[in-house]
Amino acid sequence: MSRWKVVILCLLSFMFEIGHASFQCNPKTYDGAFLNIVCVCNATFCDEIEPIGEIAEGKAIVYRSSLDGDRLKRMSMKMKEKLRKNESVNVTITIDASERFQNIFGFGGAFTDSAGDQFVSLSETLQNYIVDSYFGKNGLEYNIGRVPIASCDFSTHEYSYDDVHDDFELKHFALPDEDLKLKIPFIKKAIEKTEGNIQLFASPWSAPGWMKVTGRMRGGGAMRNDKRVYQAYADYFFKFFEAYSSHAITFWGLTIQNEPSTGADMAWRWQTMNYTAETMRDFLKKYLGPKLKENKLTETLKVMVLDDGRGLLPGWADTIFNDPEATKYADGVAVHWYGNLYSPAVLLDITQRHHPTKFIFGTEACAGYFGHHGPIMGDWFRAESYADDIITDLNHHVTGWTDWNLCLDETGGPNWAYNVVDSPIIVNRTAQEFYKQPMFYALGHFSKFLPRGSTRVFTKIEGNLAVSATSVVIEGGRRATVILSKASNSLLTRIVDSSTGFSIVLNLPPRSIHTVIWKKRK
């Protein structure tokens, strides 16, 4: 380990010892190109996020995370009208709260089988630490949760809720142990921690194999062209919501199919099913939509179409929303982050212009799915990638952002198809501890400070292309701006709220994320 890494680690450890102990990261370093730091949670300690508290007139609260080891570090700063003599800013960020856009739904992650498997492997104390870290008032305050309908790649095997061939009446429908022992206990703890303030949405990876032309959930292929199959699959959705309701779990929404474009690949390595925009439209308007609307339990569910990369927009949305029958049953578009490097964000703007009454919502993202598969412990670049994508999405009308697995093991699994990836929390069940990756703190800069119901406002950046930002107004007069700097040098930055006259100057250290919160002047 290089000398400067040792020095920084010693400083971090010293800060941990003398600071507000419950709020400080318990650091562990890994070898890497830079300082790779995770925060360790064990039976005796898990870090928390210091509350915002009261915001005095003329002051701002700033939270910082950085390559050098800050993890949502709280600071209080005074408003600054003038610079010192010979002082000039590198970047100016201007917020105009009079120009408003979409409301924020929220942020969260997925209750996969794999996440549940890791969760239940830990002691009750550590389980509570994970729930507190994600859903608690001193944690990220997640308010969104995704639940796979039956199995996906982050399961230990293929299964559906009814694998009895041609059981069109679904007499054999039943929740297996994966739901009863892995997903549901985790979800119920999150519901309790949030006092019910969590919106769950469900997504299937495939219909039961016997409903597909291939006879198997794994690999591509569409549903059998049989009205009995279409109706049985619509009934299958309802039975899922009914079964979870019997465990006191209700849902806010659903997507019709996870990544339907992958279903065109007959050799796809895990569960999927093919739809085109046209076949999704027809299944929705003829079968699924009517089934959901005719039942009180499901009549208000938010139905999202696509659930795939934004490169399929706006065409996919146009096909479904321009149909006068299908559009009655569809509320929004679900998008994944995969392929965003090759699909411009302006596609989101076009979709919003075409369909201003429908929302756009981010339903899946993860690091480690290409290049280096699986976790890279303490990797800051992946935290930057998360922050960069969330800022871009929010600035292009997306209403929220859902991470993939809430936690995984040290290999990035378990995953029956060996499609291992990274996660904000990595579990070491042998040592009975878990590690918060930099991605965890990057997510917190948004989920904790951009609450449900806040509204995105106009943000302009001048001075450096390595800086990006997004801003919201919050009920009660607060404003918040999240700033990502990917610059390798420090940048003196002024934030100006043109509607209130508020101005603050802060230094952005190299490779850092900041959330700045202030109050509207009376």
Swiss-Prot record:
The family database entries (SUPFAM superfamilies) matched by this protein are listed as: (Trans)glycosidases (SSF51445), Glycosyl hydrolase domain (SSF51011)
Identify the stretch annotated as signal peptide in this record.
Answer: 1-21
Tell me which InterPro entries the record gives.
Answer: GH30_C, Glyco_hydro_30, Glyco_hydro_30_TIM-barrel, Glycoside_hydrolase_SF
- Gene3D superfamilies attached to this UniProt entry: Glycosidases
Q: What one GO molecular function would you report for this record?
A: glucosylceramidase activity
EC number(s): the record gives 3.2.1.45
Q: Which reaction does it catalyse?
A: a beta-D-glucosylceramide + H2O = an N-acyl-sphingoid base + D-glucose; a beta-D-glucosyl-(1<->1')-N-acylsphing-4-enine + H2O = an N-acylsphing-4-enine + D-glucose; an N-acyl-1-beta-D-glucosyl-15-methylhexadecasphing-4-enine + H2O = an N-acyl-15-methylhexadecasphing-4-enine + D-glucose
Q: Which Pfam families match?
A: Glyco_hydro_30 (PF02055), Glyco_hydro_30C (PF17189)
Instruction: Provide the transmembrane region boundaries.
Output: none
Q: Where is the active site?
A: 259, 364
Annotated Gene Ontology cellular components are: membrane
Q: Keyword annotations for this protein?
A: Hydrolase, Lipid metabolism, Signal, Sphingolipid metabolism
Is this entry keyworded Mitochondrion?
A: no
Which GO terms of type biological process are on file? glucosylceramide catabolic process
Pathway given in the UniProt record = Lipid metabolism; sphingolipid metabolism
The entry's function note states:
Glucosylceramidase that catalyzes the hydrolysis of glucosylceramides into free ceramides and glucose. C.elegans contain specific sphingoid bases, which are unique or different in structure compared to the sphingoid bases found in other animals. Two examples of these distinctive compounds are: 15-methylhexadecasphinganine and 15-methylhexadecasphing-4-enine.
The entry sums up its family as follows:
Belongs to the glycosyl hydrolase 30 family.
Q: What is this protein called?
A: Putative glucosylceramidase 3
What's the gene?
gba-3
